[in-house]
């Protein structure tokens, strides 16, 4: 289950065979009714159940996996959803619809016998080497927020295609979506990657990327914007959206 800004992607697998791949679209009118992303939880959960019913898929699963949220930095891997994770995503300083993934998975799994809820490779996976954290100010350090799930899945597919193990390879992997992140993968760990949410790297369909520092400082002190408005701008209303009025590439 992958909740995104305007859609909820859902897939059903029997072993490794895909049974259903569906991108459930949410209109702007639908989402405008909800003041916060967490208010959208019943809408997205009900849409998933409705889709399964329409496709005639029995509501019987061994595991349900949701997209990981913006909690605390952790190593890559698969994590079982627990009460601490649910609390941390609900109270996270940065609210994003990815925080709903573990909640939807947990709610659906709770209705089933012997079904567990998990997340895998969330966006806050942090395996950066110490040198990669250094930036131009000793009062700051670089943080890791990136498309870990897609990058690592793509890297593993590539390794399988060439008959190698991901943990034996050195790779550069790029994710191109609403945000763009480019990671250095060294023997199964991503030791350097740009922060694709907070303004590092190339601008993208929705994100500002790296901006001229002095101009950004002047923008902050212009009195025209609040802190929250500027954070929303660099994280979702910049890039092609700001230039062209659309993120449709």
Residue ranges and their predicted role:
Residues 1-39:
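Short glycine-rich, Thr/Ser-proximal phosphate-binding strand/loop in the N-terminal lobe
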Residues 13-18, 77-88, 114, 133-138, ...:
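A glycine- and small-aliphatic-rich helix-loop capping segment at beta-alpha/alpha-beta transitions
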Residues 52-97, 124-135:
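Short beta-strand-loop/turn "lid" adjacent to the catalytic site in phosphate-handling enzymes
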Residues 63-66, 116-122, 172-174, 192-194:
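General beta-strand structural signal in soluble alpha/beta enzymes
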Residues 93-154:
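Gly/Ser/Thr-rich active-site cleft segment
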Residues 132-222:
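Glycine-rich phosphate-binding loop of actin/hexokinase-like ATP-binding domains
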Residues 222-249:
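A mobile "lid/hinge" subdomain adjacent to the ATP/sugar-phosphate binding pocket shared
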